[in-house]
A protein has these predicted regions:
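Outer-membrane beta-barrel domain signature
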Residues: 36, 44, 60, 128, ...
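Residue-level signal for well-ordered, solvent-exposed loop/turn and beta-edge residues enriched
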Residues: 50, 98, 114-116
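Short, low-complexity N-terminal intrinsically disordered segments enriched in polar/charged residues
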Residues: 1-38, 136-149
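Low-complexity, intrinsically disordered terminal/linker segments enriched in charged
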Residues: 111, 119-149
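Short beta-strand segments enriched in hydrophobic/aromatic residues
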Residues: 36, 90-92, 121-124
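A short, structured loop/turn motif at beta-sheet edges
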Residues: 77-84, 108-116
Length: 149
């Protein structure tokens, strides 16, 4: 398929993902799940081994109220036809009030009920110089700091 049209900004996609955030923070698990595609190609990827391509597994959890994503300063979305994407630098809010800076990208497709998330990748940015040590720590239990330092 050759496309000659450029991607265009999409407030519909942006609003869909921001509504997904809102539903998560409100603890509305079923309603948030309604914005996730049931397409067999659906996959959600997170940090440290989170790779979910099973619909039942993805939808089985419940969202804790006041825990979830808060939009970053400039979420952006684009579309071309029935496919589009979204990127953001949101914060993950924890129920205890703490927060973590995240990065998120998502692919959405237009379905009968509207735009639905078919892929999302959410992760914590780790500086390159710390990445290898952290991966070793997670995989092998190696301390993040050398003994005696």
């Amino acid at each position: 398929m050759t496309t000659t049209e450029a991607m265009a900004p999409s407030t519909e996609i942006r609003d869909t993902v921001l509504e997904f955030y809102r539903r998560m923070l409100a603890g509305e698990s079923d309603e948030a799940n309604d914005l996730i595609s049931r397409d067999p190609a659906m996959i959600f990827i997170g940090s440290a081994g989170e790779w979910v391509d099973d619909q039942d597994a993805l939808r089985s959890g419940t969202q804790v109220p006041n825990e979830g994503l808060e939009a970053g300063p400039n979420p952006v979305a684009y579309a071309n036809g029935d496919v589009g994407w979204f990127v953001d630098q949101p914060h993950w809010l924890f129920a205890d009030g703490s927060r973590a800076e995240m990065r998120m990208s998502a692919v959405l497709q237009r379905e009968a009920p509207g735009w639905r998330i078919v892929h999302a990748h959410l992760s914590v940015a780790v500086p390159d110089d710390q990445c290898v040590m952290l991966q070793r720590r997670w995989k092998y239990g190696i301390p993040a700091v050398a003994p005696g330092s």
